[in-house]
């Protein structure tokens, strides 16, 4: 089974991603990972950290000469700011006098509404929010994006598919309602400052960000992930835990600041009558044809051959420049929340992280379905299955 885990803190020496269960022969280089991490830093409305944050990638194990070996994969994403934080974030004990001289070490006792600070301090018995925010930070997603580069490579080599995303809306901007982008559109989407697939939508999003910036506020938004060309039958209806839509929803909800997920037309489908909610089928020369994809490529917890389409809603960033009302945990008195440098909007980057999680989950489901210890073996198993499906539909 494909499994992944990350370790590390936002201002620690490095983030680490571990990926277990990936087959041998997946073609991935350090440069490929760096490319995906650079995409994660994209986006209009990002903060100052993105200007000097550089992700130094080191593949520690599981890869030789650009190909996976079949064993556990470890990737380290170094923190270029580590020298500034070496004393404060040291894993080993530090002399109290040394810490006292560090302005950055001042206790953070005013939790931010909407962040993990308050609950984390109480749950783990911390008097300071620093240990909470360091791990809860969205910086952790860099490690997930690194791990997912292998899943993306696997899906590309076995199925010939690409995972892409685009921003549907930011704040109250006019939502995009046009056709689904394809893999050939990814470069154009990444070239957009807000990763939009439409110029009018892009302009509306930028206007929203500029207005929030002037007001000392932050914005959320909606992203969509699309994969064209997946085979029928990834996932299962056998149990709730095996349903691919449930697994995708869990993975996307596990991204920092994501508060909602929908598959296909999702919540809009609930407003329709059954006759207008489903994707009718008719025979075609090469199989079943559908004129709509309201289900988002998933029926009964399984892929149905149509484009996989899922959306995630990101809340506004909880580190608000004008600061929200809170309580100082050291005194119990009213206070304003702590404010560290932050983005006005990180929705474009959230799309790249959402791609990563979808890639990992779909690769996991594909390995469960087709098995194998190498890319060649998995691809051969898939080809046999695809031939059988095609023969059955041709009857």
UniProtKB/Swiss-Prot annotation:
Residues 272-283 have a biased composition (Basic and acidic residues). Reduced FMN (FMNH(2)). It catalyses: 5-O-(1-carboxyvinyl)-3-phosphoshikimate = chorismate + phosphate. Pathway: Metabolic intermediate biosynthesis; chorismate biosynthesis; chorismate from D-erythrose 4-phosphate and phosphoenolpyruvate: step 7/7. PROSITE patterns: CHORISMATE_SYNTHASE_1, CHORISMATE_SYNTHASE_2, CHORISMATE_SYNTHASE_3. The keyword Phosphoprotein does not apply. GO terms for cellular component: cytosol. FMN binds at residues 135-137, 256-257, 300, 315-319, 341. Residues 272-296 are annotated as: Disordered. It is an enzyme of class 4 (lyase). One of its GO terms (molecular function) is chorismate synthase activity. Its cofactor is FMNH2. InterPro entries: Chorismate_synth (IPR000453), Chorismate_synth_AroC_sf (IPR035904), Chorismate_synthase_CS (IPR020541). Pfam families: Chorismate_synt. Keywords: Amino-acid biosynthesis, Aromatic amino acid biosynthesis, FAD, Flavoprotein, FMN, Lyase, NADP. NADP(+) binds at residues 40, 46. Belongs to the chorismate synthase family. HAMAP family: Chorismate_synth. This reaction introduces a second double bond into the aromatic ring system. This is Chorismate synthase. It comes from Rhodococcus opacus (strain B4).
């Amino acid at each position: 089974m494909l499994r992944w885990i990350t370790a590390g803190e936002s201002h620690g020496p490095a983030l680490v991603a571990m990926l277990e269960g990936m087959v041998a022969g997946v073609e991935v280089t350090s440069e490929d990972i760096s490319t995906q991490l650079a995409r994660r830093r994209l986006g209009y409305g990002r903060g100052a950290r993105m200007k000097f944050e550089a992700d130094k990638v080191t593949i520690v194990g599981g890869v030789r000469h650009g190909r996976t070996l079949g064993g556990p994969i470890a990737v380290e994403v170094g923190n270029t700011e580590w020298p500034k934080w070496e004393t404060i974030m040291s894993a080993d004990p530090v002399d109290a006098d040394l810490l006292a001289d560090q302005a950055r070490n001042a206790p953070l006792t005013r939790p931010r509404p909407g962040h993990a600070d308050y609950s984390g301090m109480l749950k783990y018995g911390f008097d300071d929010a620093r240990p909470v925010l360091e791990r809860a930070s969205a910086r952790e997603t860099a490690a997930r994006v690194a791990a997912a580069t292998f899943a993306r490579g696997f899906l590309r080599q076995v199925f010939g598919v690409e995972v892409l995303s685009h921003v549907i809306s930011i704040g109250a901007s006019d939502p995009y309602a046009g056709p689904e982008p394809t893999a050939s559109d990814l470069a154009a989407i990444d070239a957009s400052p807000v990763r939009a697939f439409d110029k009018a939508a892009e302009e509306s999003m930028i206007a929203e960000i500029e207005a929030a910036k002037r007001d000392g506020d932050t914005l959320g938004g909606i992203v969509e992930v699309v994969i064209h060309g997946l085979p029928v039958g990834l996932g299962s209806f056998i149990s709730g835990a095996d349903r691919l839509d449930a697994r995708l929803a869990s993975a996307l909800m596990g991204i920092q600041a994501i508060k909602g997920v929908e598959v296909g037309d999702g919540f809009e489908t609930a407003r329709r009558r059954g006759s207008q909610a489903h994707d009718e089928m008719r025979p075609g020369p090469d199989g079943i044809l559908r004129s709509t994809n309201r289900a988002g490529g998933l029926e009964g917890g399984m892929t149905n051959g149509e484009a996989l389409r899922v959306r995630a809603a990101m809340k506004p960033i909880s580190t608000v420049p004008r600061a929200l009302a809170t309580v100082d945990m050291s005194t119990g008195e009213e206070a304003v929340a702590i404010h560290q440098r932050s983005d006005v909007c990180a929705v474009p980057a959230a799309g790249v992280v959402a791609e990563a999680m979808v890639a990992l989950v779909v690769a996991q489901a594909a390995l469960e379905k087709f098995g194998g210890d190498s890319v060649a073996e998995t691809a051969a198993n898939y080809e046999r299955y695809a031939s059988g499906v095609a023969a059955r539909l041709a009857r």
